[in-house]
Amino acid sequence: MSHADRQRAVRSSAPPLLTARELHKRFGDNEVLKGVDLTLYRGEVVVLIGPSGSGKTTVLRSLNGLETPDAGVLTLDGGPEIDFVTPPSKRTRFALRDRSAMVFQHHNLFPHLTVINNVIEGPLRVQRRPKDEVMAEARGLLARVGLSDKENAYPHELSGGQQQRVGIVRALALRPDLLLFDEPTSALDPELVGEVLIVIKELADEGWTMVVVTHELAFAREAADHVLFLDGGVVVEEGPPQQLFTAPAHERTRRFLTRIMRPLDGV
């Protein structure tokens, strides 16, 4: 099934899993988000692209309560609207986090815990699931990303790519409805980027619901169902990847893609 067919099927089959409308966020004098809208359907991969400082990570963190917008409305899976004009309660923020899991740019593994203990920490301590069940699932997930032999290693004994794969497994172990990736390859050596992108692409092919912030445009073009181009805290343009990458409607989008993709064409 092509991306276009897949997106049409996803977007016509059910109501959105998540809707964000008119998100605004200011840090001091810097208005980072100026009315961002985002709609995400179950089983869909939405990719956010744009220059540094465009607000991509702030959008991502706003979707699971790590950042609280100053204004805007968020609806998750048909639940009650969260209106950020009134700061949400701690319970509401925790409810958002319970439904999602984030893979961070710098891995954010606990340095004093082994790989397996990093993976089982959330399911055991937060979700309070049975240890035997959690251990079996964690080992299965480590096996699928090629890290069975690293379960007793510590993060400092792993390469950056291995650490990020552990970060992905840790997120999957929480059984989230929504996976959030914040530039998961930007802190990696170029030679290690591919191994992480392969894992994320496999998750996309399996139908995981994901929002991904990335500068890897070739990956975005291949894996995304829907792409948003942000600049200056607004969504300049959005659409299916084949449309946005081959025939962007806005001059700003064209300039960004030309500058980013031109060096890649000569590699």
Task: Please give the residue ranges for each predicted region.
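ABC-family P-loop ATPase nucleotide-binding domain
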Residues: 1-24, 264-267
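C-terminal boundary and immediately downstream tail of ABC-type ATPase nucleotide-binding domains
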Residues: 2-3, 242-267
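ABC family nucleotide-binding domain
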Residues: 15-241
